[in-house]
Amino acid sequence: ALWKTMLKKLGTMALHAGKAAFGAAADTISQ
């Protein structure tokens, strides 16, 4: 179904955004 594809895309985007945010936070903490 189309909504499943959309949901998967949203999940992937959220995962990447979360990783980016976590990486930025880790960089800030380590400085």
UniProtKB/Swiss-Prot annotation:
Expressed by the skin glands. Keywords: Amphibian defense peptide, Antibiotic, Antimicrobial, Secreted. The keyword Signal does not apply. One of its GO terms (cellular component) is extracellular region. InterPro entries: Dermaseptin_dom. It is found in: Secreted. GO terms for biological process: defense response to bacterium. Signal peptide: none annotated. It comes from the Eukaryota. Belongs to the frog skin active peptide (FSAP) family. Dermaseptin subfamily. Antibacterial activity against Gram-positive bacteria S.aureus and E.faecalis, and Gram-negative bacteria P.aeruginosa and E.coli. This is Dermaseptin-DI3.
